[in-house]
Amino acid sequence: MAGMEDAVIIGSGPAGHTAAIYLGRAERKPLMFEGFMAGGIAAGGQLTTTGIIENFPGFANEITGSELMAQMREQSLKNSVRIVAETVCAVDFSKRPFTLTLESGEKTETKSVIIATGATAKTLNIPGSKEFWQKGISACAVCDGALPIFRNKTIAVVGGGDTAMEEAGHLSKFAKEVVLIHRRDQFRASQILQERIKSNPKIKIMWNSIPVELKGSKLLESVTLQNTLTGEKTELGISGFFYAIGHNPNTEFLGGQLKLDEQGFIITQTGSTKTEIAGVFAAGDVQNPHHRQAIIAAGSGCLAALECEEYLSGL
């Protein structure tokens, strides 16, 4: 693409669009690469895979994730953001201006970059996992746990780390029963979280078990479990199935040019979106391995835009 960009945003979730809107209003005319099925997710990010959203401020009536992201995209366009349906596959931060390479082979030069590529939930590739996604299957208890289809029902959670403990605990507030499925005979979660789960009368633990099939008609109705020691299979009637086996940050395209934590999330300065390279910022789930909430990602995008504008003003 011809010309030098002031700011490029990589990613089109709540963090990316919030950053874009703020930079657009600062008259930077930012360029956004929203991605073309990047990480297997449509433009708009992980939120587009969420059904009903009831906890995003400003929407008293329920709205779907896709609808919310469509509104954010429209707002970005109204604020002079140029949106391109391309995926950035490589970057060069070793010299200035920075160079971004697209999957098409085209290159873009820019003075600053905001990385808002998010993180993709790890899922299981088993029969029924695609058919019942958002029809009883979810990867976010905080987002979906209070929905009517899960209230006072039996819900399964798969995982054994801190996230699984937190998700199971949260779901126990709404479900009749939560079944925590783990492939081993002990959790890897912190001891205090384990104790809370084991003392919760609404949570049942299925040790040495793995899900091998999800079944139902229009909605999810059951999960088939296989014992990892005996191979025996049992069927468990459930109305919900929640993945809590972690997330993969979408950072492979960086090629090791930024510092990442042991899970692959971008490391930023405390209380900031600044990376160790001046002019490169990271916002949203790609630099926050803990919360994975749209409103937090959006706030992070706002901070990235403000810090980016401050950086550009100092050049």
Predicted regions located by residue number:
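FAD-binding core/adjacent interface of flavoenzyme oxidoreductases
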Residues: 1-10, 25-26, 31-38, 81-153, ...
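Rossmann-like nucleotide/phosphate-binding core characteristic of flavoprotein oxidoreductases
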Residues: 1-10, 25-26, 224-228, 234-240, ...
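Beta1-alpha1 glycine-rich phosphate/pyrophosphate-binding loop at the start
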Residues: 5-79, 165-191, 261
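Residue-level detector of alpha-helix initiation sites
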Residues: 13-15, 119-121, 161-163, 288
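Glycine/Thr-rich phosphate-binding loops of Rossmann-like dinucleotide-binding domains
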Residues: 18, 41, 123-124, 165-166, ...
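FAD-site-proximal beta/loop scaffold in flavoenzymes
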Residues: 25, 125, 131-149, 245-291, ...
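A Rossmann-like FAD-binding core segment of flavoenzymes
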Residues: 76-94, 100-102, 107-109, 172-270, ...
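Active-site glycine-rich loop that binds ribose-phosphate moieties when present
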Residues: 139-143, 156-166
